[in-house]
C-alpha cells in the first residue's frame, strides 16, 4: 500500500480517467492502412500470381486435341515438325471444343539396341516415353524402329484392332504400316527442311519420313481406353487406303 506521503499531494482531478479520444472514420482508415499495408501488398501479389497462372493455364495455353508420339534416334527438323502438325490437324476434329484442331508431336529420342547412341539422350527419352505411356498421352506412334519399340514397351496393337499377347512382340510387323504404305501420309505437303538446332543437313521432309512406320496403341484397361479413344478417328483417317508391307522380308 502506498504511504500517505505519496498520496497526500495527489489532486483528485488526476484520479479521473482520461476521456478516450474518438477517432474519425478517416483517421481509423488511415491507421488501418498503416498497420496492414504490407499484408495487403503481399496477399495482392500472391493473388495476382495465382490468377495469372490460372488464366495462362486454362485460357492462354493451347490444348491439343491429339497427341502423336515420334520415337527415333534423333529429333525431327523443326520445319518438318511444324508442317506435319499442321497437316495432321486437317484429318482430325475439334475434340476439346476450343474452335480449332491442334495436333502436338511429342518427340522421344531413343536408339534401341544401339551401342553408338547418346546415353544421356536415351535416358531422357526413356523417361519421357515411359511417362507418356503410363499416362496414355499419345495414341498414335510414328516410329523409326518399330521392332525395338514393341520389344521394349509392348504397347502396340494389331492393325485389325486385336490386342497382342505378351509373347507376341516379335510379330511387330502386323502392328504397323510403313509411312509409304499410307496414301494419306505420303500425300501431305510437308515441304523441305534446312539445317537448324537439331539437324545439320537439309532435305525433303517426305523423303526423311519414308523410313518411318506408324502404329496405334493398344488399350488393355478401361481407364486407358477412355483416354485413347479420341485417337481412333484420326488413325482411321490417316491410314485410309493403306496396305501394310511391313512384313515383307520377315
Annotated model-derived regions:
Residues 163-250:
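Extracytoplasmic/periplasmic C-terminal soluble domains
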Residues 118-184:
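Extracytoplasmic "Venus flytrap"/periplasmic binding protein-like
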Residues 35-57:
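Hydrophobic membrane-insertion alpha-helices, especially the h-region
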Residues 65-74:
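Short, well-ordered beta-strand elements
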Residues 78-100:
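Short, polar/charged alpha-helical segment
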Residues 94-119:
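Acidic, glycine-anchored loop motifs typical of Ca2+
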Residues 1-20:
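N-terminal intrinsically disordered, acidic low-complexity segments at the extreme N-terminus
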Residues 22-32:
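Cytosolic juxtamembrane amphipathic/interface segments immediately preceding
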